[in-house]
Amino acid sequence: MRSAAAALSVCVLAVLLHWICWTDRSAELLGFRAADRPKADVREVLVGVLSARHNHELRQAIRDTWLGYLKQHPHFQNRVLVKFIIGAQGCSVPLEDLEDQYSCSQLELSEAAVSGQEMAILSVPDSSALLQSDVPVLSLDFKVLHSVVITQLGVFPNKPPHYLKGNITVRLLQVDQEEAVISARFSSVSPGTAADGMFYKPVEQFILPKGFEGTLLWEAEDSTALMSVNTSALRLNNGGGVLHFRSIEEGTLPHRNALGFPGLAGGFTFTVYDVEVLSEMLRGRSGRQKIREAQLKGEDEALQEESLRHGDMVFVDVVGTYRNVPSKLLQFYKWSVENADFSLLLKTDDDCFIDVDAVLMKMQRRRLTHTSLWWGNFRQNWAVDRVGKWQELEYASPAYPAFACGSGYVVSRDLVQWLASNAQHLKAYQGEDVSMGIWMAAVGPRKYQDSGWLCEKECYVDMLSSPQHSAEELRLLWSRKNKCGDPCGCS
């Protein structure tokens, strides 16, 4: 009996030793040996997950998949810290009253917009306000915030009043389009009709819908034919808030694709389209505001409850909109250097699948632990958009500096420290990924290119990240990985 018990003890001891060796070997492959395990408050990797306030289902899917795996893993739970990055404030403007869906700018509409009358963007009662242009082409950029119809195009007269010198063409173009939507030609023999200190000609009437972005061009054969106006004391009529004009102040830098210099050589008249719909919208504004306030209160309460329950959320002092994501990221960088001890920071989004085993293993195998490191999948010579979700009007170059796709990238602590220290001086551009590229261009980090950080919604067995997934898709990818090691499918 004793010999049997002794034999059994030897077997149990052998199995135990084998298990210990296997787990240590697994951890060693990933660079987490027990011998060099740091203190519990020191983390090898800090993961920041950009998350919209309302994306609680995506956050829960991450907690149920790769985040839950990290928390339960004996070698990873004290080496990797994951935090969701949340805007502390929600946008208080109802969706129907926003200028666009990407910001929190409210439509400043007034009763003047529903007058039903034809309006001019300006009048020149005194011809002494006019001055000769020193360039042959002037341009005015504007955006339509509620549908309008342009009825006439106009030019300023030369001195003396009611005289036009040379030939002038006025064209309205949609941004990034070459063909004119409407146009009119003015000359000394065909100057048009004089009204309010300007010559006007009627044009074919098109409905310019909400969101239309256009450029009005005044073109002359030589600059002496164009008259301009001192814009410093000028206020354009936006029709009660239905139009938004870009800056034409003296000294304004022309946009990189501008066809003319910012300025005015005339104007146009317009009417507001569908006044009845606009009137109804104005009447319902106060009711929508009350509903939105109640929604925000419920959203705040739900977020606080979620934060208390999970303890994995960082609220940064930013209004949670798409346009504010770069500022949101900078605020998280400030939080991270003040509140966490880490060597590397992995940034990702709440709709991204992350193969944490592959990331940590490659991190160790490639020894990606040095300073001035930026590890990601880099886009190069990426064109700057003038319209749409990725519209960028502030960055002057036609292409961005190299930037890593936002689905996942890793930066070393020293770079995070630099970003945090300079956050108040860094300009936020339209997206956090391109903003990061512009900011890092000043530092010149070592870029480690890795196509495993996917830029589009794709799936490969050796991928590190994949973006744009639903909560259900995140769970499916993770379950496949656990079942057969391939998130893309098990045969």
Curated annotation (Swiss-Prot):
Segments on the Cytoplasmic side according to the record's topology features: 1-2
GO molecular function, one term: UDP-glycosyltransferase activity
A GO biological-process term: protein O-linked glycosylation
Gene3D superfamilies: 3.90.550.50
Enzyme Commission numbers on file: 2.4.1.313
Pfam family of the protein (one): Galactosyl_T
Keyword Endoplasmic reticulum (UniProt): yes
An annotated GO cellular component: Golgi membrane
Swiss-Prot/TrEMBL keywords: Endoplasmic reticulum, Glycoprotein, Glycosyltransferase, Golgi apparatus, Membrane, Signal-anchor, Transferase, Transmembrane, Transmembrane helix
Entry's transmembrane regions: 3-23
Residues in compartment: Lumenal: 24-491
Pathway: Protein modification; protein glycosylation
Residues listed as glycosylation sites in the UniProt record: 167, 230
Family that this chain belongs to: Belongs to the glycosyltransferase 31 family.
Membrane topology: Single-pass type II membrane protein
Organism, scientific name: Danio rerio (Zebrafish)
Catalytic activity reported: 3-O-(N-acetyl-beta-D-glucosaminyl-(1->4)-alpha-D-mannosyl)-L-threonyl-[protein] + UDP-N-acetyl-alpha-D-galactosamine = 3-O-[beta-D-GalNAc-(1->3)-beta-D-GlcNAc-(1->4)-alpha-D-Man]-L-Thr-[protein] + UDP + H(+)
Location of the protein in the cell: Golgi apparatus membrane; Endoplasmic reticulum
Function description: Beta-1,3-N-acetylgalactosaminyltransferase that synthesizes a unique carbohydrate structure, GalNAc-beta-1-3GlcNAc, on N- and O-glycans. Has no galactose nor galactosaminyl transferase activity toward any acceptor substrate. Involved in alpha-dystroglycan (dag1) glycosylation.
Protein's recorded name: UDP-GalNAc:beta-1,3-N-acetylgalactosaminyltransferase 2
Gene: b3galnt2
